[in-house]
Amino acid sequence: MAAKDIRFGEDARTRMVRGVNVLANAVKATLGPKGRNVVLEKSFGAPTITKDGVSVAKEIELADKFENMGAQMVKEVASKTNDNAGDGTTTATVLAQALIREGAKAVAAGMNPMDLKRGIDQAVKAAVVELKNISKPTTDDKAIAQVGTISANSDESIGNIIAEAMKKVGKEGVITVEEGSGLENELDVVEGMQFDRGYLSPYFINNQQSQSADLDDPFILLHDKKISNVRDLLPVLEGVAKAGKPLLIVAEEVEGEALATLVVNTIRGIVKVVAVKAPGFGDRRKAMLEDMAVLTGGTVISEEVGLALEKATIKDLGRAKKVQVSKENTTIIDGAGDSAAIESRVGQIKTQIEDTSSDYDREKLQERVAKLAGGVAVIKVGASTEIEMKEKKARVEDALHATRAAVEEGVVPGGGVALVRALVAVGDLKGANEDQTHGIQIALRAMEAPLREIVANAGEEPSVILNKVKEGTGNYGYNAANGEFGDMVEFGILDPTKVTRSALQNAASIAGLMITTEAMVADAPKKDEPALPAGGGMGGMGGMDF
């Protein structure tokens, strides 16, 4: 086992705080409307330019192992806040730095670290309650657009396109972000349920212009096995032909004689049919077929529940207003399912989302909720260069997370004002002893740090602006973008409550751990091995002729 280098007490904390400061100073330069860019070197290709706090934090590794431990712990604050709320990483880092720096000074002055931690926790708990009190629900599109704009570094076009996307697919709908091919941002909305499977034969195409198969008011057959024998399909085909309606078949596979018969019937105009493969694999395929059954009011024809295809009737089929099938996608629009059954199914999937620990499963389950609840919107990010595209896409994703958080827990006045209002409300707190009270004071001073940093990045004097904001009440604050004081809500400067709350709680959590650290252990640096002596020539070789 390698030898270890161990540091204790003040020496350990000093090095750790040094690492915290290096990382936090790089990250906090990006805070606020006048925050600066940070350039990140890449191992290949052009460097990345970003104003995204978590992107900066992730790139930082320090040479000194003890300093690096401090930096990595603050990096954890940024990452955790990003995971919880999707934004607020820079605010969390600024709060953590302020808490750790003041806490380390207090410990050096001889105060009890555990009491300091208890005091900080007490203040944060009270501040979170106050944040919830001043929070307002987000209901209108304007507020959603404002939250998105602030999170995207005051880019109104991003805030507006996110608000439009949410309006079209609902607050539960899936909104994805992709790299576009143009210069402007574009919004592409897919209504109804879409899955990534297209027609099994080009002979099903009936719309030559769009090269798709369009079915109006069709019946929908859902089957979880292969269909290769046309005799199994005859009862359903006869029923559909009598009703004079088209038919969409979604099955594991339609092949051989069955597929050939369907193609011939379609070409001759006897019955309009389109066959597609079921989406997904294994259990996910079964679940998605069930979703389709609920959406269309049909039944999945499955031997597992005692239903055989040859016994299926027209009553087992689902219905929809319209179905569009292209080469790669199938879209079911306005299914005839019972709305109560759809809501129940959505609730069931949401429970699974809460229970799952896999990010991949969570993403797929959320997609299923969206497909049942309203549709999918795709924001295509436009930019003139690849570097700008990457930076802009990261900002759009941040803004999207922030707006979701705002819908979930409401909004508070932005620009660091909410934390200033919370600290004024909990300023009378007292701890069980002097050290705990000092811990409370540390937390209250730290809650001023985001506003101070926003003002400093705007080139103004933080203390002067902070005192003026403290003199005001409610939403009164400082707009760093134009240097005006006024109502932050009217200025459109809003932060999601969840983002501010998560930033404060995560910063306090890591700061508490770091203040109470008494020893640090790292691998000792390896000493360079002594070099081998230089080899000399062989003796006794003189005078030889070659």
Curated annotation (Swiss-Prot):
Q: Name one GO molecular function term.
A: ATP-dependent protein folding chaperone
Provide the protein's localization.
Answer: Cytoplasm
UniProt keyword Cell inner membrane present: no
Q: Could you give one GO CC term from the UniProt record?
A: cytoplasm
Provide the reaction this enzyme catalyses. ATP + H2O + a folded polypeptide = ADP + phosphate + an unfolded polypeptide
Look up the domain of life of the source: Bacteria
EC annotation from Swiss-Prot or TrEMBL: 5.6.1.7
Tell me which Gene3D superfamilies the record gives: GroEL, GroEL-like equatorial domain, TCP-1-like chaperonin intermediate domain
Q: What class of enzyme is it?
A: isomerase
Listed A to Z, the keywords are: ATP-binding, Chaperone, Cytoplasm, Isomerase, Nucleotide-binding
* This protein's record includes keyword Cytoplasm: yes
Role:
Together with its co-chaperonin GroES, plays an essential role in assisting protein folding. The GroEL-GroES system forms a nano-cage that allows encapsulation of the non-native substrate proteins and provides a physical environment optimized to promote and accelerate protein folding.
Family of this protein: Belongs to the chaperonin (HSP60) family.
Q: Which PANTHER family match?
A: 60 KDA HEAT SHOCK PROTEIN, MITOCHONDRIAL (PTHR45633)
Please describe the quaternary structure of this protein. Forms a cylinder of 14 subunits composed of two heptameric rings stacked back-to-back. Interacts with the co-chaperonin GroES.
Q: What is this protein called?
A: Chaperonin GroEL
Q: Which organism is it from?
A: Xanthomonas axonopodis pv. citri (strain 306)
